[in-house]
């Protein structure tokens, strides 16, 4: 299990992981790593939250929120934000399904993708600022948001098909079973309940699950399935929805 965790941490983040810690794990077994997603999210969110707490006293809430969101993006290499931008460029192009998928493969940033990045990043900064003004624990909120968003991404993998012939998303999409999905969601729920007691965290997770499930169905209808880009979009939007649900 530890080898699987380190392999997943290296796969979906840019955090330094000694190669020997994940050596010997076949790429075809990576789908089993879905159950580690909430734990990885917990780690990323905690680091981002610590950055916020350290900077808040020095430069104020808005700038602390800005840098915490920036650090979160840097730790993932902008991987999920890139998926969000590509998904919006493709889906909102109003072209045929095949053309949408081609646009999503294009490395150039389009208008819809640019707008999505601006709105999502700005919304996160504003929500974190508002949560601070309301006295919510930011470290716990960010840790829970990142754990839940990565856990609920399993809803776009279970019983979904991969929309392309090949790609990184094919490692997970359509490859995880019901037990893995339940364990992943269960871990995310436990983290949310422990970090944000009083059912506040669990209620926010339920809202996030509903939103991501609906997103998955809409993308399935539009694209004929899911891709690595849509998983990234789901994670980014899941973080935002969870934080909004805490207001």
From Swiss-Prot:
One of its GO terms (molecular function) is adenosylcobinamide-GDP ribazoletransferase activity. The chain crosses the membrane at residues 34-54, 59-79, 113-133, 138-158, 194-214. GO terms for biological process: cobalamin biosynthetic process. Pfam families: CobS (PF02654). It catalyses: alpha-ribazole + adenosylcob(III)inamide-GDP = adenosylcob(III)alamin + GMP + H(+); alpha-ribazole 5'-phosphate + adenosylcob(III)inamide-GDP = adenosylcob(III)alamin 5'-phosphate + GMP + H(+). GO terms for cellular component: plasma membrane. Its EC number is 2.7.8.26. Its main location: membrane. Keywords: Cell inner membrane, Cell membrane, Cobalamin biosynthesis, Magnesium, Membrane, Transferase, Transmembrane, Transmembrane helix. It is a multi-pass membrane protein. It is found in: Cell inner membrane. InterPro entries: CobS (IPR003805). Its cofactor is Mg(2+). Pathway: Cofactor biosynthesis; adenosylcobalamin biosynthesis; adenosylcobalamin from cob(II)yrinate a,c-diamide: step 7/7. It is an enzyme of class 2 (transferase). PANTHER family: ADENOSYLCOBINAMIDE-GDP RIBAZOLETRANSFERASE. Belongs to the CobS family. Joins adenosylcobinamide-GDP and alpha-ribazole to generate adenosylcobalamin (Ado-cobalamin). Also synthesizes adenosylcobalamin 5'-phosphate from adenosylcobinamide-GDP and alpha-ribazole 5'-phosphate. This is Adenosylcobinamide-GDP ribazoletransferase.
